[in-house]
Amino acid sequence: MLSYLKQNLCFYLSSKILILALAISAIVSACTTFYVISLEAKNFSTIIGFLLIDLAIFLILGILLTQKFFSKNNDNDSSRLQNRIVIAFSLVAAIPTIIVSVFSVYFFNLSVKAWFDKKISTVLDQSVIVAETYIAEHKVQLKETALAVAEDLSDMYYDLIHNPALFTKTLNTEADMRSLDEAIVLNKSTNTIVANSYLSFSLSFATIPAHLIKKADLGEPVEVKSDPTKIRMLIKLKEYNDVYLLVGRLVDNKIIDHIDATNGAAAEYNSLKNEIDNIQIKFSIMFIFIALLLLFVAINFGVLFTAQIVKPIKKLVTATDKVKDGDLTVQVPENEVDKDEIGTLYVAFNRMIKQLSRQQRDLVIAQRAMAWSDVAKKVAHEIKNPLTPILLASERLLKKFSAEIKDKSEFESYLKMIIRHTNDIKNIVSEFVLFARLPAPKFTKSELVYLVKHIIEARKLLNDNIVYTCDSNVDQFDFMCDATQINQVMINVLKNAEESIEGQEFGRIDVILDIKDDFINVIVMDNGKGFPPELIGKATESYVTTSSKGMGVGLAIVKRIVEEHCGVLDIANREDKGAIIDIKFDLKELHLKVRRSCG
C-alpha cells in the first residue's frame, strides 16, 4: 500500500498539472509581492515573507523542471549529450546574468549614494535656508516699517482723526518714504477703510482671520498671509479705538518662483531619499526575477534547440545499434533533416550502410563461389578420371557386340543411354572446370554490334521455332573487351532465354543494344516462363537453377565476366510474361581498368 501511494505521489509531483500550478502561483506571488512593496505603509516583515515565498516557489519549480528533464533524458548517450547542451545553455545564461545583476546592483548603489551624497543634501538645504532667510529678512524689515508708521500715525492722532484727507495724504507720504506697496488703515468697529495709499487694494476685516486680529491686539505686528507674492503686516494703532494699520510689500515673481522651485526640489529630493530603501528593494527584486526568467528561457530554449540537434542524432544512434545487431537494411530518413552537416552525415551514413550491405553480399557470394570452386576442382578431378573409360567401353560394346546380341535394339538403347548420360556428366564437369578456372579477360578491340548479331544468327540456326530480333541505336561500336568471354556471356544469356521458352508454340527473344554517353546497355527479353519470384535475387548465385540440364553456373559465370568488364547484371520478370536481363557496362571505369592493366 505504501509503495503504491509512493508511486502515485511521485507521478503526481512530476506531473504537468503541478508544474503548471506552480508557474501560475509564481506569477501571482510575484505580482502580490510587487504590490506590497509599492504600498506607502510598508511592513518589511511582510515584504520579506513574500520574498521568501517567491524564492521557495521558484526553487521548487526549478527543481521539478530539472528533475523531469533529466529523468526523461538519461537513457542513452544522445540524451546525455542533450543534458550537457542544456546545462551549457543554462550556465551561459545564468553566469552572465548573475555577474550583470551583481554589478548592476553595485553600480546602482554607488549611483544612489552619489545622488544622495551629503554635499548635495547640504547644497539643497542651504538653498532652502537662503530662500527662507530672504523672505524672513523682508518680513523683519516690513515689521520694523509697520512699527515706525504706526508710531508716526499715533503721534499725529489729534491732527488726523478728524481730517480724513490729511490722514490719506500722510499715509501716502509714509508709504512713499518707506517704499511700501500698500498701506491701509482699517476700522474694526465699522468694518471700513479709514485711509489707504494710492496703490492699495480694497480690503475688509472679513478677509483677515480673527486669530490674527487677536494677536495684533497685543501690540506686535502680525503677518497676514493672503497673497504668496506679497508680504503684509497688521498692527493696532495705540491711540485709536479699534483702528489697525495694514502695510505690505510685493516680492519679485522671479524670486518667488525660484524659492518655490528650490523648496519643491528639496522636498522631492528628501522624499526620494526617504524612499531609497524601497527603491533598492524593488530594483533588487526586479533583477532577481529577470535573472530567473532568463534562466528558465535559456533552459527551455536549450531543450528545444538541443531536441532539434539530438533528435536526428538519436535516430543515427538507433540505426547504428541495429547495424551492430547485424541489420544492414536500416536507413535514416534524409528528407527529415536540413541540408547541413547533419544532412550530410545522414547521406554518408546511408551510403555507408548500402556499401556495407553490398560488400557483405559480395563477400558472401565470393566466399560461396570460392567454396564451390574448390568443390568443382575436386569433383571434376574425381569424376573425369573414371568417366573417359566408361564412355570408351560403352562405345566399344556398341560396336563389337551389337551384332551378336539377339535383342539388338534394346541393347543399343541401353548403351546409347549410358553414352548420353555420360556426355551429360562430361558437360557438367566442363561447366565445373570453366567456373573454377575462369581466366582473366584479355582486352582487345571488338566490334560489339557485329559480335552480338553474329551470335544471334548462330542461335537462329539451332532454334528455328524461336523468333530473334536485334535492335541497335548505332551501326557499329568498337568495344574494349575479351571477345571470347563476351561471346560466352551472350550464348549463356540466350541459352537461358531459349530454355525458358521450351514447350511453347511461339517463342520470341528480343535483343536491344543501347549505346549512349559512357554506358552500354545490352537488354535481352523473352516471352518464356520467367524466373520464380523467390529466385530473382539468387539467380546469379552458383548452382541455383530451375533447369534439369545444368548445374546453375551459367548466370554465375555471366555475372563474373560482366563484373570483370566493369558492368552490372540486373535480372527481372516482365510485367506480362517472360524475363528481362539487362547488362550495363561503364565505359569510363572499363577504360581506366584497361589502362591500369596495360600500364
Swiss-Prot record:
A molecular function annotated in GO for this UniProt entry is: ATP binding
* Documented EC number(s): 2.7.13.3
Q: Which residues cross the membrane?
A: 17-37, 44-64, 85-105, 285-305
* Source taxon at top rank: Bacteria
Q: Catalysed reaction(s)?
A: ATP + protein L-histidine = ADP + protein N-phospho-L-histidine
Q: Where in the cell is it found?
A: Cell membrane
The principal localisation class reads membrane
SUPFAM superfamilies, alphabetically? ATPase domain of HSP90 chaperone/DNA topoisomerase II/histidine kinase, HAMP domain-like, Homodimeric domain of signal transducing histidine kinase
List the record's Gene Ontology CC terms alphabetically. Answer: plasma membrane
Q: Report the top EC class in one word.
A: transferase
According to its record, how does it sit in the membrane? Answer: Multi-pass membrane protein
Q: Which UniProt keywords apply?
A: ATP-binding, Cell membrane, Kinase, Membrane, Nucleotide-binding, Phosphoprotein, Transferase, Transmembrane, Transmembrane helix, Two-component regulatory system
What InterPro entries does its record include? Bact_Sensor_His_Kinase, HAMP_dom, HATPase_C_sf, His_kinase_dom, HisK_dim/P_dom, HisK_dim/P_sf, NtrY-like_N, Sig_transdc_His_kin-like_C
* Domain Histidine kinase: residue ranges: 378-589
Residues annotated with Phosphohistidine modification: H381
Every copy of the HAMP domain together lies at: 307-361
Q: What is the stated purpose of this protein?
A: Member of the two-component regulatory system RT0603/RT0550.
Protein name (database record): Putative sensor histidine kinase NtrY-like
What species is this protein from? Rickettsia typhi (strain ATCC VR-144 / Wilmington)
